Swiss-Prot record:
Chief location bin: cytoplasm
Assigned protein family: Belongs to the TRAFAC class translation factor GTPase superfamily. Classic translation factor GTPase family. IF-2 subfamily.
Gene behind this protein: infB
Name assigned to this protein: Translation initiation factor IF-2
Residue span(s) of domain tr-type G: 615-787
InterPro entries according to UniProt: EF-G-like_DII (IPR053905), IF2_II (IPR044145), IF2_N (IPR006847), P-loop_NTPase (IPR027417), Small_GTP-bd (IPR005225), T_Tr_GTP-bd_dom (IPR000795), TF_IF2_bacterial-like (IPR000178), TIF_IF2 (IPR015760)
Organism the protein comes from: Prochlorococcus marinus (strain MIT 9303)
NCBIfam families: IF-2, small_GTP
Length: 1124
């Protein structure tokens, strides 16, 4: 099948199991243009051709019900084993839909039987020319008793006009025909063919009725031939006569199977459709007409679509029929109603009897070999026997098993030409006949073929090859078939399997087409674009972006090319470019998807806890913009002063505090989490929201809604927790709580006073106003939420913060969300294994155990755990270590990917910048007090412009600065940056010895500013044009070849060797250096405003009055980082 929905002729023939020429012939009948086997036709035309071929195949393969003219095949089998010595009367078989029967009377002149040896010599040495018989009829003859007949093929007559087979109807194949004596006469040929039972010829004399074999599919087994019957005087009895049968009128027109067009000289006369061929001796029939034998057809089942002409015939057992030389007139037609091939001189004019390959040797040599089968007579009668006794029982051949359709491997050979000369002492067959003789002798070959090809039989070759010729080949194949050996009886059953397996084998074209379809389907399935693109890092390569968008990388490269950007698949793209490309393909971009970090992914309460749940304290996260008073509000609640001791007055850690208050006469606990408000601590805020139950949003009354306020709102909504708004700083001048409510209403946070569902409480942290009301609202919302946990199980929770203490080692702040944590418990926090050695609360008091919603600091981890990881207590260390091992490998892979992403730069960009001297890198080693601070600083560094200077963080970890860090910095030329940490012993001395720059910060603002200034310091300073002044030309003085301009300084000043630009009528006519500056014939360095001077330039002398001279100089200026 071609890609345009067409099919080629050879592919259609392969599907139908036919030859190319058969399909071409069918296409010609349907007026379909097809020149050769490689021509393409449409699916509709292919369907028409298939219908035509299948219709013809069905018509030819059905059991025949009515005989047709010109298509008779008579097959005679060996007699069944009986003791009867009488001659069995031969019977003529009823014709099938594609056959016509004609029984020839025997006409030899000798009334006595002749021995086989004598006949062999006579037939070889003296072939008799064909003679014209005088109205012969058959009479009963005597023959040697109990000799089996060799299969005989009847001469086949062909009408003068082409005929189409009529629609066959089923008939009984086992019903014997009544014996009828033949006679010659002119009678309507259709009269003898209307009955469903076949009419046959008999010989006079009573005898047993011939036994009819009910399995017509297998060819007759060759046996011993009986002596031919003697001719007798024509009889005058009235009986249905064997005669040339004309063309009956078909009841229903049926399309004939496609066949090869006949040569011009062999086409029947279409103008005389009603004329039947006459026997020899008639007025319109010539004697000695050249005859051709039918083409052989392979043994066994016919192929699909092929008429089974021989397979459906009745096989008769009895005495063979003697042929007369008068058969020549009607034997000149083949089974397809075509003229036959001419016979050799001396041979009868009728169809020559096909002989087995073993008998060909006897025919070609003057004397026969002893022990070889005797040849046949030239008149068609059997000469000798194979030496069997009278009582020998011939083997009964069973029909072969159906075989799968199989295309012929070569063209079948045909009979030699009649006029071909024969050299004495030399066989006249070709090599193909020898080859086929060897094949016929092989017991493994079931499809017997005999090809007797003459030199001048090109037309016969064309007719008998392929689909059309196989219909004729059954006659020769059946006559030459030998009994199958018992070994090979089971082999035909395996042939259909082999044929089917061979047909299932894929060709190269089919395999390529299948792979192309699979690739196309996979590409179409892959092109399901995501609804939203989440960019985890600041940049992506073209290939990574193509994979995330489920498109080809070439599409992105083409899109970038149209935007003026030349990129490769390994090119790194920054966030603006990624957004532009993604929007072009209709996919929005979200960077770092901070909302995902705030979503609650793990359910802490399991099904086994449902029977043991009790109320637990709420976890409240205080969120809001920087400097809006979150920590001051917590100080007012806790009655402490944490804000006063914080560096820079801002919170840079997440803190966990537990407050116990009296509510309704009962003590109630509330756990508060204080989150940073600086923009660098987005991950900390998201972490706090992930574990919280209630979010308290602090908004300053004098500042309103700010960016981090909006971020806190999105975090709370992502975590699906209730929001309580605390409007702080109501005591300050300019405070407007109503304005804050209005701004919050724009974010779908509507106050209860305005008909919404959000609790808003105006408070003052400094004066302590409405603090009790805020706590009451928190407890009220807690009761509505119905927070519960199971304290009687092993603890589960989240790591809020972690850091490396100089004395205590790794320390983690844990929030227990379910169960009870006890000292000595073995827990796994992400990829870190720990055993609780000690626990302290927010006030520093040691604890033995901690229940749900408690926040504690735990000691005893193997290393600093990652903030935000969930921890779980295991019953023993073995199970915990197994879990940690799996997580550690995943954590290493993730950490390596992040490090590679931080230093990712495309090779093309690096080589280009290096060639221009623009490649700059700043190597950093970052040490901080807690994991959250490291996370915040790394996130801020990602936001810095990286077009001209790349920041590479070689090492980032919580803890103090060690001597190992100093050695790494010295080897890589890095700067050590510490945040709220100290230097270990020996690190300071090592840094001084190696000259490593160590910076320590306690406020994140200053740290980020210094890093940005260091990055700008790596940039080359740029030259900036600085204006000096202007002067106007008042007069021009010519001195030799040069000229001097007398000028008046209008603004600024002029300096010698400065850059000048001469403008004339707003056009620049010269730009260069000022070489000479004089005042009153003295060289001066500069001239100020309001003075006159003379100016000379070595490369310019075309001064004119009223020219404007602009003086400037180039100065270096520190470059700043550009975001583009």
């Amino acid at each position: 099948m071609t890609s345009s929905g067409k099919i080629r002729i050879y592919e259609l023939s392969k599907d139908l199991g036919l030859e190319n020429k058969d399909v071409l012939h069918a296409a010609e009948k349907l007026s379909i243009a097809a020149k050769s086997h490689s021509s393409s036709i449409s699916d509709d035309e292919a369907k028409r051709i298939r219908g035509l071929l299948r219709q013809g195949s069905a018509a030819n393969s059905a059991p025949p019900s009515k005989s047709e003219p010109g298509k008779t095949i008579l097959s005679v089998k060996k007699a069944a084993p009986t003791a009867i010595k009488d001659v069995a009367p031969p019977m003529r078989k009823a014709t099938s839909s594609s056959e016509i029967s004609q029984v020839k009377p025997s006409a030899p002149a000798n009334p006595t039987p002749t021995s086989p040896e004598r006949l062999s010599r006579e037939s070889v040495a003296h072939p008799a020319p064909p003679t014209r018989p005088v109205n012969p009829t058959t009479t009963p003859t005597s023959s040697p008793p109990k000799t089996a007949a060799r299969p005989v093929n009847a001469p086949i007559s062909r009408p003068a006009t082409p005929s189409r087979p009529s629609a066959p109807t089923p008939r009984s194949a086992n019903k014997p025909s009544s014996p009828v004596p033949p006679s010659t006469g002119s009678k309507d040929p259709r009269a003898g063919q209307t009955s469903t039972s076949s009419k046959a010829t008999t010989v006079s004399g009573g005898g047993p009725r011939p036994k009819i074999i009910s399995r017509p599919q297998s060819p007759a087994a060759p046996g011993r031939s009986a002596p031919p019957a003697k001719p007798s005087i024509p009889s005058d009895r009235k009986a249905p006569k064997p005669e040339l049968v004309g063309r009956p009128k078909p009841k229903r027109p049926v399309v004939a199977p496609p066949s090869r067009p006949e040569p011009e000289g062999q086409r029947p006369d279409k103008k005389r459709p009603g004329i039947s061929p006459r026997p020899i001796g008639g007025p319109n029939q010539r004697a000695n007409t050249p005859q051709r034998p039918g083409a052989p057809i392979r043994q066994g089942k016919t192929r699909p679509g092929q008429p089974r002409s021989a397979g459906n015939t009745l096989e008769l057992v009895g005495k063979p029929i003697r042929r007369d030389r008068s058969d020549a007139g009607s034997a000149g037609r083949d089974s397809n109603n075509r003229p036959g091939a001419p016979t050799r001189p001396g041979m009868p004019a009728g169809m020559r009897k096909p002989v087995a390959p073993g008998e060909l040797m006897q025919l070609q040599k003057p004397t026969g070999r002893p022990g070889t089968p005797p040849p046949r007579r030239p008149d068609g009668t059997s000469v000798g026997t194979r030496g069997g006794s009278e009582g020998a029982t011939p083997p009964v051949e069973r029909p072969a098993s159906p075989t799968a359709p199989k295309r012929p491997g070569h063209r079948p050979a045909q009979a030699p030409a009649a006029g071909a000369p024969r050299r004495p002492g030399r066989p006249d067959w070709d090599d193909s006949a020898k080859l086929e003789a060897l094949r016929n002798k092989s017991p493994q070959k079931q499809r017997q073929k005999v090809h007797i090809i003459g030199e001048n039989d090109d037309a016969l070759t064309a007719e008998t090859s392929g689909y059309a010729g196989e219909q004729q080949a059954v006659v020769l194949t059946a006559s030459l078939a030998r009994p199958a050996k018992p070994k090979s009886q089971k082999k035909p059953a395996s042939k259909p399997v082999a044929a089917l397996r061979k047909r299932k084998k894929e060709t190269t074209r089919q395999r390529q087409r299948r792979r192309a379809m699979e690739l196309r389907a996979a590409r179409e399935a892959k092109q399901v674009r995501p609804e939203m693109l989440i960019v985890p890092e600041a940049n992506l390569t073209v290939q990574e972006l193509a994979d995330m968008l489920s498109i080809e990388s070439s599409e992105i490269i083409k899109s970038l090319f149209f935007k003026g950007i030349t990129a490769t698949v390994t090119q790194s793209l920054d966030l603006p470019t990624i957004e532009a490309v993604a929007e072009e393909f209709g996919v929005p971009v979200l960077q770092d998807d901070i909302e995902e970090a705030a979503k609650k992914t793990t359910e802490m309460i399991e099904e086994t806890d449902l029977a043991h749940l009790i109320r637990r304290p709420p976890v409240v996260t205080v969120m809001g913009h920087v400097d809006h008073g979150k920590t001051s509000l917590l100080d007012a609640i806790r009655k402490a002063r944490v804000a006063a001791v914080e560096a820079g007055g801002i919170t840079q850690h997440i803190g966990a505090y537990q407050v116990e208050i009296d509510h309704g006469g009962q003590p109630r606990k509330i756990t508060f989490l204080d989150t940073p408000g600086h923009q660098a601590f987005t991950a900390m805020r998201a972490r706090g929201t992930k574990v919280t139950d209630i979010a308290v949003l602090v908004v300053a009354a004098d500042d309103g809604v700010r960016p981090q306020t909006l971020e806190a709102i999105s975090h709370a909504r992502a975590a699906k927790v209730p929001i309580i708004v605390a409007i702080n700083k109501t005591d300050k001048e300019g405070a407007s709580p109503e304005r804050v409510k209005q701004e919050l209403s724009d974010q779908n946070l509507l106050s209860e006073e305005w008909g919404g569902d959000v609790v808003m409480v105006p408070v003052s942290a400094i004066k302590g106003e409405n603090i009790d009301k805020l706590l009451e609202m928190i407890l009220l919302v807690t009761e509505v939420e119905d927070l519960q946990a199971n304290p009687d199980r092993l603890a589960k929770g989240t790591v809020i913060e972690a850091h490396l203490d100089k004395a205590k080692g790794p320390v983690a702040t844990l929030l227990i969300q379910n169960g009870t944590l006890k000292t000595g418990d073995v827990l796994a926090a992400g990829p870190v294994l720990g055993k609780v050695r000690a626990m302290v609360d927010d006030s520093g008091a040691r604890l033995k155990q901690a229940g749900p919603a408690d926040a504690v600091e735990a000691l005893g981890f193997s290393e600093v755990p990652t903030a935000g990881d969930e921890f779980e207590v295991y019953p023993d260390e073995k199970s915990a270590r197994a879990v940690v091992g799996e997580r550690a490998s995943d954590a290493r892979a993730t950490r390596l990917a992040q490090q590679m992403a931080s230093r990712r730069v495309s090779l093309a960009a690096m080589s280009g910048q290096a060639s221009d001297g623009e490649l700059k890198e700043l190597n950093l080693i970052l040490k901080a007090d807690v994991q959250g601070s490291v996370e915040a600083i790394l996130g801020s560094l990602e936001q810095l412009p990286k077009d001209e200077v790349q920041v590479r963080v070689l090492l980032s970890a919580p803890g103090e600065i060690t001597e190992t860090d100093v050695d790494l910095a010295a080897a890589s030329g890095a700067v050590i940056v510490g945040f709220n940490t100290s230097m270990a012993s020996g690190a300071k001395r090592a840094a001084d010895a190696t000259g490593v720059d160590v910076r320590d910060y306690d406020v994140i603002y200053k740290l980020l500013e210094d890093i940005q200034m260091a990055m700008e310091g790596l940039l080359e300073p740029e030259l900036v044009e600085e204006s000096l002044g202007e002067a106007e030309v008042r007069a021009v003085f010519t001195i030799g070849k040069s000229a001097v301009a007398g000028c008046y300084i209008t603004t600024g000043k002029l300096q010698r060797n400065c850059r000048v630009r001469v403008r004339r009528a707003k056009q620049v006519v010269f730009e260069g250096d000022l070489d000479s500056l004089r005042r009153n014939k003295d060289d001066v360095k500069e001239v100020a405003t309001g003075f006159e001077c003379g100016i000379g330039c070595d490369r310019f002398a075309n001064w004119e009055e009223r020219d404007i001279i602009e003086a400037h100089k180039l100065v270096t200026k520190r470059r700043t980082l550009s975001s583009s």
